[in-house]
Amino acid sequence: MDEDLVLALQLQEEWNLQVSEREPAQEPLSLVDASWELVDPTPDLQGLFVLFNDRFFWGQLEAVEVKWSVRMTLCAGICSYEGRGGMCSIRLSEPLLKLRPRKDLVETLLHEMIHAYLFVTNNDKDREGHGPEFCKHMHRINRLTGANITVYHTFHDEVDEYRRHWWRCNGPCQNSKPYYGYVKRATNRAPSAHDYWWAEHQKTCGGTYIKIKEPENYSKKGKGKTKLRKQPVSEAENKDKPNRGEKQLLIPFTGKGYVLGETSNFSSGKCITSHAINESQEPLSQDHSANALRPHSKTEVKFEQNGPSKKTSVASPVLSTSHQNVLSNYFSKVSVASSKAFRSVSGSPVKSLTVGDSTTKSVSAGSQRRVTSSRTSLRNSLKAMESTYVTVPQDAGGPEGKLPSKRPRIEDKTFFDLFFIKKEQAQSGGGDVTSSSHPPAAAQSPSGASGQSRVVHCPVCQDEVSETQINEHLDWCLERDSTQVKS
């Protein structure tokens, strides 16, 4: 039994020694351990940020953005603040950190995360950026992780590697320390007045900076890019523009415009207007009474070509010279202020008796008969057109002749004339309209009214009428004209 006990104790001691040797190996590795260079040489930036935020900053940096910067070459990282709302972004220099070991990436990221934490928690009391608050968190994280976070970086060689554009001053400052007149930059931006030290340099030195170094084939690459970019733009701009030597052909206006609804097949055709919608119906005469058209009346537009005639939709016609003559005779547009066409009689405008203007009319009985006959012929033609529009839908047999029965337009004067004529017939009971309640002008003598001896001339029949009876007399004259049209 003693031998067995001794053997058991020996085995227990050996086991304890093995366990004691394994315990240090089970401790977590440091964030900057050298073994990470082989295990994870290029870590995920966003993954590291989420891990460090949970372990060292209590999840306070969830609203902070972290990303790589491909143009930043002067510093390893930067933290940009955006107001007091807790929004900020961390940018790390990809050109500098991709040449450095993983340890530098971790330390730079933790450095910028401390700046973001101080800003988010409104504890940014460090006016210089790396004050006591920053150093407190920096030492805390260094003790927990074994890292060596500092307030500066030592990537000077990498920074100089990207400064490939050099300038040197040709003035006295080229012999003074510490720069000896050199200006080295990563971008092709020559020293100018935009630099904060430019004014002082002009006072003390006054020299000119001359470029002495740039990357290989930099000028050739720049010229090639500019040529490739400018050629398509210049071609696109000058594509639709004529050359300066060429003259633009100016085509004068021929006087013929475009008809609404016209297609390319009708471009060579000749446009004519016709009042007949049915082809078998005879056209109206071409005298003044037939050509008197209202602007709102609808006529059919035909296009004559070498082949068979084609019809288009109904459109408003363009009044010809004969139409305009009839309208000008019936609807006089001469102003009453014209001394040639009118004269003042007892304060009322009366048409002048002089002959010479085509729009003035004589007050003689013969001229009145001519005016009355022209009005009668005009109204007869309008009445014939109205009957034509009413009877066409019944006679039209083809699909082109079928027109839907529509209510007459309110603007049509013919419709109003026929409406008032029918209304007067219904009121008079079929009797003669001339036997209306309006007496003739002779019966309404101005002598009947005492104290009112002022007499004016009627603008329609040129009779002398009392000023108090002129409105009733005008109504009677208009009714007489409508009666003549009816007869």
Swiss-Prot record:
SUPFAM superfamilies membership: S-adenosylmethionine synthetase
EC number(s) from the headed UniProt entry: 3.4.24.-
GO terms classed as biological process: DNA damage response; interstrand cross-link repair; positive regulation of protein ubiquitination; protein autoprocessing; protein-DNA covalent cross-linking repair; proteolysis; response to UV; S-adenosylmethionine biosynthetic process
Assembly and binders: Homodimer. Interacts (VIA PIP-box) with PCNA (when ubiquitinated). Interacts (via its SHP-box) with VCP/p97. Interacts with RAD18. Interacts with KCTD13 and POLD3.
Gene3D superfamilies: Classic Zinc Finger
Biased composition (Polar residues): 280-289, 306-317
Motif PIP-box mapped to chain: 324-331
SMART domains for this protein: SprT (SM00731), ZnF_Rad18 (SM00734)
Protein name: DNA-dependent metalloprotease SPRTN
Binding residue positions for Zn(2+) 1: H111, H115, H130
Organism of derivation: Bos taurus (Bovine)
Activity regulation field: DNA-binding activates the protease activity: single-stranded DNA-binding specifically activates ability to cleave covalent DNA-protein cross-links (DPCs). In contrast, double-stranded DNA-binding specifically activates autocatalytic cleavage, and subsequent inactivation.
Pfam families reported for this sequence: SprT-like, SPRTN_ZBD
Biased composition, class Low complexity, residue ranges: 435-453
Residues with site note (Cleavage): K227, L228
Chain positions with N-acetylmethionine modification: M1
